[in-house]
Amino acid sequence: MKRIILSLVAVTLIGLNLNAQNMNKKALVVYFSVTGNTATVANNLADAIGADIFEIEPMQLYTSDDLDWTDENSRSSIEMKDSKARPEMNNNLDDAKEYDLIYLGFPIWWYTAPKIVNTFLEKTDMAGKTIVLFATSGGSGMENTVESLKPSAPKATFKRGKVLSKDASQEELKEFAKTALK
């Protein structure tokens, strides 16, 4: 009986230690936003967890015509059909070395992340990082996100995360940040 109790105590302490290690990691919230919904969530998440923040800025801003998914000739439709499309960024994250944990947010386009997110991952050394994905969406899920992003940062560990509402409370965002690491 003593062994069982000691084993349970040891397992509990190990679990608490792992959780404390995750909470002590330096976090960065990175996001791409066109309409402002993902920016709202990203800024609120960074505030809720005390993380730094970085916005992925496209070299050429997207217009409402660019985002018309019903038009097969719109910019976003063309980019999303081309697996090699990598829209240029207007900025770069100079150094990600100080961060262990990256919360990466974006709007869902065609059940996955916009191609500029791949551009960011390929331009930034993500080796050894844990990347927790989050998204905003008008109704689509995140079904293909890890699969489409992993090749752009093969030495990172991806966590699927979830779709978040721009109206998510600080408590909801803290809970998301905590449970996403499990």
Enumerate the language-model features and the residues they cover.
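Glycine-rich, N-terminal phosphate-binding loop of Rossmann-like dinucleotide-binding domains
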Residues: 106-107
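A short, structured loop/turn motif at beta-sheet edges
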Residues: 96-98, 123-129, 154
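Surface-exposed, flexible loop/turn segments at secondary-structure boundaries
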Residues: 12, 35-37, 59-61, 139, ...
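Conserved N-terminal glycine/acidic-rich loop preference
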Residues: 136-142, 170-173, 177
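Bacterial Sec-dependent N-terminal signal peptides
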Residues: 1-22
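Short, glycine-/small-residue-rich phosphate/pyrophosphate-handling segment
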Residues: 132-165
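N-terminal beta1-alpha1-beta2 submodule of the flavodoxin-like/Rossmannoid cofactor-binding fold
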Residues: 20-100, 111-113, 118, 122, ...
